[in-house]
């Protein structure tokens, strides 16, 4: 017991986890009064099952709460920022800014995936890079901040890490729609997306796509799904022709 070479004790694992959560707190600029909220926000159901924590031991309830908080904050933000935009357009903007790929992108920007607690099998099959898992954890983290620090703290997190640089993010996540409208207005040629490469096992694929106006290639993109790769290609296409 406690000899060199032994597996880490429970206390050592707890200390290691505390150090990781403290690092995340520094990154997001919010320090939890109740650390349990943060730990639970990072706990995926696969880890909870593996550690026999029960159905309530994972982040799904916090995700449910965070989703509602995010909808309110993003709606309030867009209502105040775009005073001349009708309801339908505001709904579209909100949907593009808080959709699964967008939340996953935002989370990766501040390094959330490295802090997630996943079951060994889920981790080995690429779960840490899966948009659905990362975006769900982002909502769970928001829910945890809301419970621990209230609406003001939750709003500050959203404004700093999700709704920051809104023009660039909207351009990126609406790229296919924006490019289609640009091509229809300026060109007589048809916009075409072409799959160039598909690599990797089913659980961790990579796609490369190019977009063309007629026969002329205007952009390429890489992504973990074909749709994501098309968005990246469209973004580069916009940058080239605008």
Task: Please annotate each region the language model reported.
Residues 1-242:
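Double-stranded RNA-binding/processing signature
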